[in-house]
Amino acid sequence: MKRVVVTGMAGVTAFGQDWPSVRAKLQAGRNAVVAMPEWAIYEGLNTRLAAPIADFVLPAHYPRKKTRAMGRVSQLATVATELALARAGLTDHPVLTDGRTGIAYGSSIGSTEPIRAFGVMLNDKSTASITATTYVQMMPHTAAVNAGLFFGLRGRVIPTSSACTSGSQGIGYAFEAIKHGYQILMVAGGAEELCPSEAVVFDTLFATSQMNDNPELAPRPFDRQRDGLVIGEGAGTLVLEELEHAQARGATIIAELVGFATNCDAAHVTQPQQETMQLCMEMALAQAGLKAADIGYISAHGTATERGDIAESHATAAIFGDKTPISSLKSYFGHTLGACGAIEAWLALEMMQEGWFAPTINLTEPDPACAPLDHVMGNGRMLAVDYLMSNNFAFGGINTSLIFKRWG
């Protein structure tokens, strides 16, 4: 089996596109959530909160020929990937285009504006709203295909459209592709664009925050006063590489990916199950050859939903007790759906290198219905971590767990 390392990583978030910018916002202890008064036009939509990326602009050097089939979700994915490849020292490298580099990337759905166009067609009985690229922008694998085409990646394409585990499964399946010798390099991650149609999905489940007048107080993962999640948007990309290839080309190695597991609850499409969440984490530990005590930090899924936080906390505590530091980055960016697993893995690795781990903001009184955990609160925590775990869970009962090892 091949060893797999991270040689590049980047993202596009509501806090910026680089670690110094994101770190400054994390350390300020404020979230990216804002009121969305424009959503008032949707009768029956209760939440008016989101965490949009307000300043995203497609780079001027992107040619129209390569972007005309991109919706916003593909644009976010492509920019995050360009930044990650640059950090890996792979911009215009021949390995990208000789078949040895693939892509495993996902989003919950494609872009949402094309869906509206098809709705107009069905309602008006006219195809006037449809163009040659409408479907390509909305297809479930649009982010993987567009990012792959943009950089000329000729290896395997693994689209991961699995809701909130799209990004983490992308990383995990990329890891497996390299580990088993199918590819030398993999671009991996996830993206999501903001749309009120995503908010209403959770609204109908009574799972969205109603703190419309106090966006700075939501979401509140694991807190007694939490009242639901907030939708966000963004993209995250990791460049995974076979260790010997990375060393041969003199790449800067950020971390090693040593464990990945994914499984399914097979119980209920929207109600998470503690037992299989726990099993997923145990499987990742077993693959990495680690004990629970070896993990120095856990990046929680932490959505701030009632059932999700309870199930996750009990699954985590059953393995780690209350001794392993844990926090949820969704308290800052909201739930970025298909992007969250990749964004959270990227930022967890940045924090491991920094030695400072962000707290779960708005967590002031842990819910007694949740299992006791070592929540990172307040101003964050300085930690020397050799291994970290990043967990994500999704509709359909899909669970993922990734384990990264500090390099050097």
Predicted features and spans:
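Condensing-enzyme catalytic core mediating Claisen C-C bond formation in acyl metabolism
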Residues: R3-T7, N31-A35, D213-A288, Y297
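Conserved beta-ketoacyl condensing-enzyme motif
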Residues: V6, Q27-S162, A191-A199, D294-G308, ...
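ACP-dependent fatty acid/polyketide chain-elongation machinery
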Residues: M1-K66, A88, E244-E256, W346-T360, ...
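Active-site-proximal alpha-helical scaffold in enzymes
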Residues: A77-L90, P140-A143, G148-A191, V230-A251, ...
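Conserved small-residue
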Residues: G8, L26, T81, I103, ...
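Acyl-CoA/ACP chain-elongation machinery
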Residues: A35, Y182-D227, F260-Q274, G302-D309, ...
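Cysteine-centered functional microenvironments
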Residues: A10, A60-M70, Y105, K125-Q137, ...
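Glycine-/small-residue-rich "gating" segment that lines the acyl/pantetheine channel
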Residues: D124-T131, G172, E176, E193-A248, ...
